[in-house]
């Protein structure tokens, strides 16, 4: 309802970018966090928080593990809803639409920008999978860290998928 509020014309994307920039400038914690709602083919819904990683002419960009529940749901039903809320500003933005993967080259370009710890964590765990124990994942993480000895983890390929919602 941005346009209905008379905020800066009738371009909701431009208004969203202004509000996002305001939240960043005001150092609102987790200003880039968004609730992502997906639905399985049968209609069962789920929601979780992910981070906005960019905005381009095709939409909003976020990254996820293709094997996770959200990755599987987006593959089977490529529609989603997103919601941002900036506490203290009384602002929220809701986005609904289709989701698509970007090219493998775009996904590969993102991987090296992730902090090393995040790379290791993504490679050591299978998001949304049941764990036998926390120690199991910590052991995998430590083993990868030893093997790579300070180098960045190579992109695991299928582990990370870049999705766009528009």
Protein language model regions, located:
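Binding-site signature for planar aromatic cofactors or substrates
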Residues: 1-166
């Amino acid at each position: 309802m941005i346009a209905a509020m008379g905020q800066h014309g009738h371009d909701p994307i431009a208004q969203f970018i202004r509000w996002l920039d305001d939240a960043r400038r005001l150092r609102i914690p987790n200003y880039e966090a968004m609730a992502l709602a997906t639905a399985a083919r049968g209609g069962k819904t789920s929601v979780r928080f992910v981070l906005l990683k960019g905005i381009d002419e095709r939409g909003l960009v976020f990254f996820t593990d293709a094997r996770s529940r959200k990755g599987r749901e987006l593959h089977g039903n490529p529609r989603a809803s997103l919601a941002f809320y900036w506490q203290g500003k009384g602002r929220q933005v809701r986005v609904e639409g289709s989701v698509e993967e970007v090219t493998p080259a775009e996904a590969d370009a993102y991987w090296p920008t992730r902090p090393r710890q995040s790379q290791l964590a993504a490679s050591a765990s299978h998001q949304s999978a049941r764990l036998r124990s926390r120690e199991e994942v910590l052991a995998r993480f430590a083993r990868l860290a030893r093997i790579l000895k300070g180098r960045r983890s190579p992109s695991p390929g299928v582990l990370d998928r870049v999705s766009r919602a528009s």
